[in-house]
C-alpha cells in the first residue's frame, strides 16, 4: 500500500519539476534576449566602438620640421630629404621572424660599419628559442627562482640570461654583425609602431627593389625621412640642435611631450631656437589605422590623416648685417691683438636691438681662444657670457636715486674725493687733476663721475657724505636691494625675456661687502651679459619702457616647393615693465647720454661716438678695471649707445673685456661703426 502511494506521489511531482525547469530555462532565455536587445539596440554604438577598437589600432609618425630663415629669407637650417627603409611591427612578430626579416633585408641594403654593443649581440644570440631555453635552464636556481621557489618573471629571467652570455659565445662574422645591426633596429620598434631602419644611403635601384618585394618582408616599406642640416653662418650657434630618431624625446622632458601627443622616438628641438619654437617647427603627424583579422594579425594599413611639414620661422636678424658686424668686431680685435692689447681678452661682443619692438638686429661675438689664438664666431656668447659693465650703468644708479627720494631732478652734488674712515679714497678719473667742483646729474653722466654715484649709493643707505666719515652698515642689505631693484627694471641682473632658452641672468652675488656695494654703483661688481646691457640702453632709448628682445619676427607657412611661404603670425612686441621714474627725469638721462657724445667740455667722455657718425648718436662709455694672468692691469672697454638721438631706431651694447691697452677706449668707436653700418643697410629717418 505504501509503495503504491509513493508511485502516485512521484508521478504527480514530475510535471511540477518539469514546469519549474521549463520556467527557469524560459527566464534565462528572456534574460539573454534582454541582454542582446540592450547590446544590439539600446547600446549598439558603444559595443560597435569596442569591437572596432579590438580589431584596429592607430599609429602616428612625425613629418619633416619647418625651417629657419634670416630676415631676408636666407635659410639658416634646412631639411635634406632622403628615401629610407621603414618598419611597422605587428604584435605577432617573434624574434625568429625579426631575424628572418633582417637576413632578407640585408640582401638589398648596404651596411658599412655596424657599431654594436655587447647587449645587442647578446639579444641576437638569445633570439634563437632553443638557445634561450638552454641558457635559462643552465642558470643557477637563484637566477631562475625567487625565495619561495616560484619562477621569476620573464623579464628578470631574460636579463639574467643576458648577463650569463659569455663573450666567446658572441663571435660573429662581419656579415653576421650587419644582420645583427638590422635585427637590433627591428627589435627596438614597438608593437604597431613604425621606425626608420638605418642603412647606408639608398640608391634608386635599391628603393625600387625593396618597394616591389615588400610583401616578402612583412612590415618593411620605403618612406621619406630627413636630416637636419645647420648651414655654416654666423648665427649657427643660436639655431640649436634636434634629437635623432634613436635618441627620441629627452628623458627629462619625455612625460611632458607624451602628454602633448608626441611619440617616444619623435625628433624634437633640444636647444636654443630649435627648442624654443619646437611646437611651431614640428611637423603635423600622419595617422595610420592598422586593421587586424580575427586572429590578431595585421590585415591592412590605411592612412587616415596625411602628415605635413612644420611651419617655418623667420628671424629679425639680417644675415648680411650680422656678418658685417662680425667682420667689424674681428677687425677691431685683430687690431688690438697687433698692438698687444687683446692678448688676454676672451673676445669682443656686440648686440643691436630695435628699442621700440625689441627686435634683435644683430647679436655678434668673436671668441678668442687664449691657448691657440684662434678667433671664432660666438653669437651665443651674447646671452651666456657675463662681464663687469663699468660706468655704462650709471644712468641706472641715478634712476635708483630718483626712485628712492635720494636725488631730485638734475640735482647738483660736489664731485670730490670720497674718503671713508680707514679706507683709500674713491675718485673720478679726473678728480686729482681738477679737485672738487659742483656737477649736475647730466654732467655726472657726461663726465662719468664715480663720486656722484658713491654719494647716491650712500643716500640709499640713509647717510650723507662727510669727509673721513664712519659708515654704518645696518642698512647695507636694504640699500643693495633698492639699487639692484632699479637695475632690474632696466634688465640688468634679471631675465631679459628673449625668445631663447637658458639665457644667463648675470652674476649677482648674494654675499657682498660695503665696498662691493659702493663699487656696484659705478658698475664694478655685478656682471651682466651683452644682451642685458643692450636691453638697458634700449629701455633708456624707449623712454623707460622695457621690451623683451626677440629673435623671431614671424611664423610662416610653406610654399608649393616646401620653402618659405606666406606669413601666418606676426610676433608682437612684449612690454615687460616701465622704469619707475618721471618723464622729466628720463629726459635728464637722454640729455646726459647726448652730452657724452656731443659735449664740448674737456671732461666729455664719449666724443668717439659722434666723430664720423652718419646719424646723431647718444651713448655712455664704460671702463671696468680688472687684472689678467700675469698681474697686468686691464680694462673692460664697454659702451652703450642709441641712434638717432631724437628718434631711436637702434640701440647697441659693446663689450671688449680684458684689454691691456688702457688708453684705447675702443668701445664707443665700435658702437659708432655698428650704427653706421645699420644706417647703410637700413637708412633711418
Question: In which residue ranges do the predicted regions lie?
Answer:
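Active-site His/Glu-centered metal-binding helix of metallohydrolases
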Residues: 37, 392, 396
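Short, basic/aromatic recognition patches
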Residues: 48-60, 321-343
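A short acidic/glycine-rich loop-to-helix N-cap element
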Residues: 657-667
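Gram-negative outer-membrane assembly/targeting C-terminal domains
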Residues: 679-685
Amino acid at each position: 500500500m505504501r509503495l503504491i502511494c509513493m508511485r502516485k506521489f512521484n508521478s504527480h511531482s514530475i510535471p511540477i519539476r518539469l514546469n519549474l525547469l521549463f520556467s527557469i530555462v524560459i527566464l534565462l532565455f528572456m534574460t539573454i534576449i534582454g541582454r542582446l536587445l540592450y547590446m544590439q539596440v539600446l547600446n549598439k554604438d558603444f559595443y560597435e566602438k569596442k569591437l572596432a577598437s579590438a580589431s584596429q589600432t592607430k599609429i602616428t609618425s612625425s613629418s619633416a620640421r619647418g625651417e629657419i630663415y634670416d630676415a631676408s629669407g636666407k635659410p639658416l637650417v634646412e631639411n635634406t630629404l632622403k628615401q629610407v627603409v621603414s618598419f611597422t611591427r605587428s604584435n605577432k612578430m617573434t624574434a625568429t621572424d625579426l631575424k628572418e626579416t633582417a637576413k632578407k633585408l640585408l640582401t638589398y641594403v648596404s651596411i658599412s660599419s655596424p657599431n654594436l654593443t655587447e647587449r645587442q649581440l647578446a639579444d641576437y644570440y638569445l633570439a634563437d628559442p632553443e638557445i634561450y631555453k638552454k641558457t635559462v635552464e643552465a642558470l643557477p636556481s637563484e637566477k631562475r627562482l625567487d625565495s619561495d621557489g616560484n619562477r621569476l618573471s620573464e623579464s628578470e629571467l631574460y636579463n639574467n640570461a643576458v648577463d650569463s652570455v659569455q663573450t666567446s659565445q658572441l663571435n660573429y662574422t662581419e656579415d653576421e654583425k650587419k644582420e645583427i645591426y638590422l635585427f637590433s633596429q627591428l627589435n627596438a620598434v614597438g608593437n604597431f609602431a613604425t621606425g626608420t631602419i638605418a642603412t647606408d644611403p639608398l640608391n634608386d635601384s635599391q628603393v625600387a627593389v625593396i618597394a616591389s618585394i615588400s610583401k616578402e618582408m612583412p612590415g618593411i616599406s620605403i618612406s621619406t625621412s630627413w636630416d637636419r642640416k645647420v648651414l655654416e653662418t654666423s648665427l649657427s650657434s643660436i639655431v640649436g640642435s634636434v634629437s635623432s630618431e634613436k635618441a627620441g624625446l629627452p628623458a627629462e622632458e619625455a612625460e611632458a611631450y607624451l602628454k602633448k601627443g608626441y611619440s617616444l622616438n619623435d625628433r624634437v628641438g633640444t636647444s636654443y631656437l630649435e627648442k624654443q619654437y619646437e611646437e611651431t617647427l614640428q611637423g603635423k603627424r600622419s595617422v595610420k589605422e592598422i586593421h587586424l583579422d580575427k586572429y590578431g594579425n595585421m590585415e591592412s594599413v590605411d592612412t587616415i590623416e596625411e602628415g605635413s611639414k612644420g611651419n617655418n620661422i623667420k628671424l629679425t636678424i639680417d644675415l648680411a648685417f650680422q656678418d658685417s658686424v662680425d667682420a667689424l668686431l674681428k677687425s677691431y680685435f685683430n687690431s688690438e691683438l697687433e698692438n698687444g692689447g687683446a692678448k688676454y681678452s676672451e673676445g669682443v661682443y656686440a648686440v643691436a636691438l630695435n628699442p621700440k619692438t625689441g627686435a634683435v638686429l644683430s647679436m655678434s661675438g668673436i671668441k678668442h681662444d687664449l691657448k691657440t689664438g684662434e678667433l671664432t664666431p660666438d653669437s651665443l656668447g651674447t646671452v651666456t657670457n657675463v662681464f663687469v659693465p663699468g660706468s655704462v650703468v650709471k644712468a641706472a644708479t641715478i634712476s635708483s636715486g630718483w626712485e628712492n627720494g635720494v636725488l631730485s631732478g638734475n640735482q647738483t652734488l660736489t664731485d670730490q674725493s670720497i674718503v671713508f674712515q680707514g679706507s683709500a679714497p674713491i675718485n673720478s678719473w679726473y678728480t686729482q687733476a681738477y679737485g672738487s667742483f659742483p656737477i649736475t646729474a647730466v654732467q655726472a653722466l657726461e663726465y662719468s663721475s664715480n663720486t656722484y654715484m658713491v654719494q647716491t649709493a650712500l643716500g640709499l643707505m640713509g647717510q650723507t657724505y662727510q669727509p673721513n666719515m664712519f659708515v654704518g652698515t645696518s642698512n647695507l642689505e636694504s640699500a643693495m636691494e633698492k639699487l639692484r631693484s632699479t637695475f632690474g627694471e632696466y634688465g640688468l641682473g634679471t631675465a631679459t625675456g628673449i625668445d631663447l632658452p637658458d639665457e644667463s641672468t648675470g652674476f649677482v652675488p648674494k654675499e657682498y661687502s660695503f665696498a662691493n656695494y659702493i663699487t656696484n654703483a659705478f658698475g664694478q661688481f655685478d656682471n651682466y651679459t651683452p644682451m642685458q646691457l643692450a636691453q638697458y640702453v634700449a629701455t633708456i632709448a624707449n623712454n623707460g619702457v622695457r621690451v623683451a628682445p626677440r629673435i623671431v619676427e614671424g611664423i610662416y607657412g610653406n610654399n608649393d616647393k616646401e620653402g618659405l611661404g606666406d606669413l601666418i603670425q606676426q610676433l608682437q612686441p612684449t612690454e615687460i615693465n616701465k622704469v619707475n621714474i618721471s618723464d622729466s627725469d628720463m629726459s635728464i638721462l637722454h640729455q646726459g647720454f647726448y652730452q657724452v657724445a656731443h659735449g664740448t667740455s674737456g671732461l666729455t667722455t664719449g666724443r668717439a661716438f659722434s666723430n664720423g657718425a652718419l646719424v646723431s648718436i647718444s651713448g655712455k662709455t664704460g671702463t671696468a678695471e680688472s687684472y689678467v694672468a700675469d698681474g697686468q692691469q686691464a680694462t673692460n672697454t664697454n659702451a652703450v649707445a642709441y641712434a638717432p638721438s631724437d628718434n631711436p631706431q637702434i640701440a647697441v651694447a659693446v663689450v671688449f673685456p680684458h684689454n691691456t691697452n688702457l688708453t684705447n677706449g675702443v668701445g664707443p668707436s665700435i658702437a659708432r661703426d655698428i650704427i653706421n653700418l645699420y644706417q647703410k643697410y637700413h637708412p633711418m629717418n
